[in-house]
């Protein structure tokens, strides 16, 4: 990716970075195992970002 990035693109990339995390352990405990994984999880090699 190029070094120069417009601020709008940087914001979208940052949002994608932050939303690409697993479910915290306390959430799994609080929901009694109902929520185990993040269905929106994305792998950088397999899935392409449309930003």
From Swiss-Prot:
Coiled-coil residue spans: none
SUPFAM superfamilies: Ribosomal protein L39e
GO molecular-function term, one example from the UniProt record: structural constituent of ribosome
Family per similarity comment: Belongs to the eukaryotic ribosomal protein eL39 family.
Gene3D superfamilies: Ribosomal protein L39e (1.10.1620.10)
The entry's keywords: Ribonucleoprotein, Ribosomal protein
Protein's GO biological process: translation
InterPro entries, A to Z: Ribosomal_eL39, Ribosomal_eL39_CS, Ribosomal_eL39_dom_sf
Record's protein name: Large ribosomal subunit protein eL39
Record-annotated disulphide pairs: none
Xref: NCBIfam families: PRK01242.1
GO cellular component: ribonucleoprotein complex; ribosome
């Amino acid at each position: 990716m190029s070094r120069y990035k417009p601020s709008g693109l940087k914001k979208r990339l940052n949002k994608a970075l932050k939303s690409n995390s697993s479910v915290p352990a306390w959430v799994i405990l609080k929901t009694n195992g109902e929520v185990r994984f993040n269905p929106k999880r994305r792998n950088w090699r397999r899935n392409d970002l449309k930003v």
